[in-house]
Amino acid sequence: MTFPNINPIIFSIGPLAVSWYSLSYVVGILLGWFYANKIIEKFKPQITKKNLEDFITYAVIGIIVGGRLGFVLLYNPSRYFSNPIDILKTYEGGMSFHGGALGVIIAAYLFCRKYKINFLSLTDIIAPVVPIGLFLGRIANFINGELYGRITNSSFGMIFPNSDLMPRHPSQLYEAFFEGLVLFCILAYATFKHKTLKKYGLNSGIFLIFYALFRIAIEIFREPDIQIGFILDSLTMGQILSVPMLLLGSYLICQSNPK
């Protein structure tokens, strides 16, 4: 397969450059906000549209700060400790989903404590929305030619411009499909068909379990981060960080209570 060599920069005006990567965050947040509002309109949960509007600022800060610090601390601490100013260069890429997820969880906790809202009631609204951002983010990773997969002889192999010119799995597209499209459909089906919002924590648990399973499986095709490599000979950082999500998701489903 031929890699579609797309310019990572959409357009630039003087020193200001707009990239597909940054656009994926903006569009993901806007589409997520729209979709969450539709869910609130239909099911009338404890969370109101006004609550959601107020939470957006918390969520954006949680995503950016958590995602960036997660990448810095978990994937490449030596580089950023040597050059702390590089931490601010988010336009170069380098965001961790697990860090971003933790950032949003902390933001949601602080928001719920301030406004006296049930924490799981908020995360159950967030869960069906997240796959939208995951899909767009992985497509942006693909356009950037980063986070590509392992070497393969299969017909799916692509030669990425920033790699060693060996055909590799387009693992970004695998993640976009499973963690984005498939997970979105699973949660939409659960939310609208099985009315999972009637039980605190059920949507959150479903998201955590399926994301973790998809991530663990797709990491088999994804090249480990060069600065980390394999852990315990065969595991990747993404797989290890997904195990707590799997356990927490199982707990939330088992403990989910009717509202």
UniProtKB/Swiss-Prot annotation:
Keyword set includes Cell inner membrane: yes
GO-annotated molecular function: phosphatidylglycerol-prolipoprotein diacylglyceryl transferase activity
Pathway the protein acts in: Protein modification; lipoprotein biosynthesis (diacylglyceryl transfer)
ATP-binding keyword on record: no
Subcellular location per the Swiss-Prot or TrEMBL entry: Cell inner membrane
Enzyme Commission number, as recorded: 2.5.1.145
Keywords (A to Z) from UniProt: Cell inner membrane, Cell membrane, Membrane, Transferase, Transmembrane, Transmembrane helix
Annotated GO CC locations: plasma membrane
Residues reported to bind a 1,2-diacyl-sn-glycero-3-phospho-(1'-sn-glycerol): 138
Transmembrane segments: 9-29, 55-75, 92-112, 117-137, 172-192, 201-221, 228-248
Main location: membrane
Membrane topology note: Multi-pass membrane protein
Pfam families attached to this UniProt entry: LGT
GO BP annotations, alphabetical order: lipoprotein biosynthetic process
Family under the similarity heading: Belongs to the Lgt family.
Function of the protein: Catalyzes the transfer of the diacylglyceryl group from phosphatidylglycerol to the sulfhydryl group of the N-terminal cysteine of a prolipoprotein, the first step in the formation of mature lipoproteins.
Full protein name: Phosphatidylglycerol--prolipoprotein diacylglyceryl transferase
Source species taxonomy: Bacteria, Pseudomonadati, Pseudomonadota, Alphaproteobacteria, Rickettsiales
